[in-house]
Amino acid sequence: MTIEEIISEIENMSVSQLAELVKALEEKFGVSASMPVAVAAPVAGPAAAAPAEEEKTSFDVILKEAGAKKLEVIKVVREITGLGLKEAKDLVESAPKPIKEGVTKEEAEELKKKLEEAGAVIELQ
């Protein structure tokens, strides 16, 4: 398989499939795709926040339940993940499920706020 063929296959993957691929590559090769993001985060934020983030730099945003306003939650999930309507609906209906994995604390808090405003119950891990 050529590099172009691999890239073509990756381009056709959904966001959730890409997340699974990244996780599998991280486990297979013992690396972390979130490390460059974690290194860049303290530079953008205040210096005082850096020591607190050293303990846990990578967070998963988990949808525990959609709540009463499921349609609003589906819209936000589509916005966050880039999934199609059916994929986002399936994801929301199969909660608890990860919405986004390996994100910075700042991004995780922002996503949690958006989803909770739409009516979802969210957990950060």
UniProtKB/Swiss-Prot annotation:
Any single biological process term in GO: translation
Entry annotated with the keyword Ribosomal protein: yes
One GO CC annotation: cytosolic large ribosomal subunit
Keyword Lipid metabolism: no
Record note on quaternary structure: Homodimer. Part of the ribosomal stalk of the 50S ribosomal subunit. Forms a multimeric L10(L12)X complex, where L10 forms an elongated spine to which 2 to 4 L12 dimers bind in a sequential fashion. Binds GTP-bound translation factors.
Function per UniProt: Forms part of the ribosomal stalk which helps the ribosome interact with GTP-bound translation factors. Is thus essential for accurate translation.
UniProt similarity note: Belongs to the bacterial ribosomal protein bL12 family.
Name the record gives this protein: Large ribosomal subunit protein bL12
Gene encoding the protein: rplL
